[in-house]
């Protein structure tokens, strides 16, 4: 198993790169870009995983999708990547909001989900071990709401949620 970096852009492009693409630089140097921005596109999510991990992707509509990490095409840092809609049966109007790498779907780990409307849900990670190819509804949303945040949690973890109220 090889350690990889998986990157998702704001416009829905996904790519996998070896960790060796990101080597340490000396002090005072400019560093290296993780990707070339294509106009308005920016990096949305950047995670580390192994090739045999399962990537669980969550959409703004509350649907989860599973994709083996090795199925994400490996690219160079300069490459744009592959559109998620070419890898999974995701409707074009649906956007991926979270990407979780999973090595093992254990019963002692939970997923904590938060919606734009302030609803929170905790579900066992093992409930996502058999996601169908067309996805699995992770959370039912009210009209106008969207799934915005999903993280792994184990017993004893705390979640602090802040909200900005515009007056």
Map each language-model feature to its residues.
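Residue-level signature of catalytic and energy-coupling elements of molecular machines
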Residues: 12, 62, 118, 165-166
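Conserved structured catalytic cores and adjacent interaction surfaces
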Residues: 102-165
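Hydrophobic core positions in small helical hairpin nucleic-acid-binding modules
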Residues: 3-106
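Conserved small/polar residues in nucleotide/adenosyl-binding loops
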Residues: 1-5, 165-167
């Amino acid at each position: 198993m090889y350690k990889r970096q998986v990157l998702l852009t704001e416009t829905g492009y996904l790519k996998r790169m070896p960790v060796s693409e990101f080597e340490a630089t000396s002090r005072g140097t400019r560093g290296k870009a993780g990707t070339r921005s294509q106009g308005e596109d920016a990096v949305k999510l950047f995670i580390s995983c192994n090739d045999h991990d399962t990537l669980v992707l969550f959409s703004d509509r509350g649907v989860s999708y599973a994709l083996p990490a090795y199925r994400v095409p490996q690219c160079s840092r300069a490459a744009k990547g592959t559109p998620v809609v070419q890898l999974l049966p995701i409707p074009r109007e649906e956007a991926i909001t979270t990407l979780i790498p999973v090595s093992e779907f254990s019963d002692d780990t939970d997923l904590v989900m938060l919606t734009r409307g302030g609803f929170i849900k905790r579900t066992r990670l093992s409930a996502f071990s058999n996601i169908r190819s067309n996805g699995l509804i992770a959370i039912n949303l009210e009209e106008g709401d969207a799934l915005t945040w999903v993280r792994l949690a184990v017993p004893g973890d705390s979640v602090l949620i802040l909200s900005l109220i515009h007056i």
